[in-house]
């Protein structure tokens, strides 16, 4: 018999995390490496574990994720979003808790594009009155 498997896709900025959550002992693997090795910063590790700790499920599930694109913060938050979606799929009661904590909401903020005639997205060239 195949073991139960829950999937979720998380996105943040330009990062996409494809997440699989399965019953286990709490191991989190990202692109074939342990989460502590992949995300050395404690803030990123905390962000990744947030959905599991909210539901007191940290030692009950293993997480296997493949992440593409973006930088470390975008990747960590994409992974958090993917884990939250997978846990919501696993347990409909947990969905309300995750939603209230804002973990199921896709953070739509992204870098604003640069416009022609400007130095950056909004920075204008210096103006000389005379």
Curated annotation (Swiss-Prot):
PROSITE patterns: RIBOSOMAL_S9. Keywords: Ribonucleoprotein, Ribosomal protein. Coiled coil: none annotated. GO terms for biological process: translation. It comes from the Bacteria. Pfam families: Ribosomal_S9. The keyword Ribonucleoprotein applies. One of its GO terms (cellular component) is cytoplasm. GO terms for molecular function: RNA binding; structural constituent of ribosome. Signal peptide: none annotated. The keyword Ribosomal protein applies. Belongs to the universal ribosomal protein uS9 family. This is Small ribosomal subunit protein uS9.
């Amino acid at each position: 018999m195949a073991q139960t498997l829950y999937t979720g896709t998380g996105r943040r900025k330009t990062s996409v995390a494809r997440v699989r959550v399965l019953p286990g002992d709490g191991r989190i693997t990202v692109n074939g490496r342990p989460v502590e090795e992949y995300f050395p910063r404690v803030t990123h590790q905390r962000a990744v574990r947030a959905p599991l700790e909210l539901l007191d499920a940290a030692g009950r599930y293993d997480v296997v994720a493949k992440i593409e694109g973006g930088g470390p913060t975008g990747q960590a938050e994409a992974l958090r979003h993917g884990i939250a979606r997978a846990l919501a799929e696993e347990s409909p009661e947990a969905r309300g808790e995750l939603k209230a904590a804002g973990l199921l909401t896709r953070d739509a903020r992204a870098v604003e594009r640069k416009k022609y005639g400007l130095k950056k997205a909004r920075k204008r060239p210096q103006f000389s009155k005379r």
